[in-house]
Amino acid sequence: MQKYREQITQIAQDIGFNDISFIDAKPLLKSEQHFIEWRQKGFAADMNYLLKENPINARPQELLKEAKTIIMLTANYYSPCPPRPSLEHGRIAAYATGLDYHKVLRKKIQELINHPSLEGIFKNSKFFTDAVPLLEKSFAKEAGLGFRGKNTLLLSKETGSFNFIAEILTDLELALDPLSSKAVGLEGCNGLRVEPFSPSAIEPPQGHCGKCTRCIDICPTNALPNPYQLDARKCISYQTIENREEIPQELHQGIGEWLFGCDLCQTICPYNRKHGDEGI
């Protein structure tokens, strides 16, 4: 299986995924509890797919009973935002400026699992990208592909937070990556050295961002009431994408020119401001 793992890694990188990790398909019970507590505070707003009592969230075997390994993948989508023609033009989130990422990533994963050199080993597998209520950020963090930032997004020292997350659940027993192996020895946003993230720690992990609060400070609707905590009811992305009702009057000024989504808590992050190459 080690041979296949090396082949999978090389193929994934060749077709555009910037990071890949193999982890045990075990339930993330601490992440599940953290999610339940977040939901109980009303922070999920009226997103019904998050409000349901759903065991899928942190339990891979609910999606694939025979799952033994999860192959976690990330694909960077950073692209310099073109200047608006005038102040009368609105703004949209970076991920929405290109093709439908669900279709793009599904095509790439199909190219990966159907690659001739893999000899059809993915016969009993399922793959997803933001299509089921799986705690993708938690599994990606568990796989060592990054750490949870104060804006609640998955942050990678190499590629920042402008990353799509995808996963392949399989019955293959592939060699597993040491947990958090890719998240050790990072520096905080303010340059301070911080302790490596321990995947066994109760979420949310404290660290890596140091004393930096730029993402919290820049949010015009105060959607980040505390570090590592998002109140979707006040989030511009929720209000302009998910909300099917009238946007509350008190949020109008903060939303401003945003028409679809928002990137403020990402573009202000020092981990994103250093990137110059366009992503997938």
Where are the model-predicted features located?
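Auxiliary alpha/beta "docking" domains used to position bulky ligands
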Residues: 1-182, 205-206, 247, 256-257
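A short, charged helix-loop
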Residues: 171-174, 202, 234-243
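Residue-level hotspots at or immediately adjacent to binding/recognition sites across diverse folds
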Residues: 210
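Iron-sulfur cluster-binding cysteine motifs and their immediate structural context
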Residues: 214-237, 244, 255-280
